[in-house]
UniProtKB/Swiss-Prot annotation:
GO terms for cellular component: mitochondrion. It is found in: Mitochondrion. Keywords: Mitochondrion, Plasmid. This is Uncharacterized mitochondrial protein ORF3. It comes from the Eukaryota.
Amino acid sequence: MAYFVPSIVFNGLKSNDKEPLGNFDSSMSPSSYDITVWISSLSKKIASVFINVSLSVKVVTLPKPIDLTLPVGNLIFAFTTKKGWVKLSL
């Protein structure tokens, strides 16, 4: 049986010169992946910061069905600006 495990990667870019500010990867790390399928990429402008979001789905093959209910913590990522750090929490 195969399960789909989403992975989201945030790439912070400044809007004026497109300089990378940092990366955030929320993917989990099972012991092995069969394949990785990149679905889509989108760009959304927030104030003076562009956040490019790439979504990938990793197919994980498991020997038997299991409960995939996991606790969800805070996703925290930050960007540098001319006035200091901007910290976003989800």
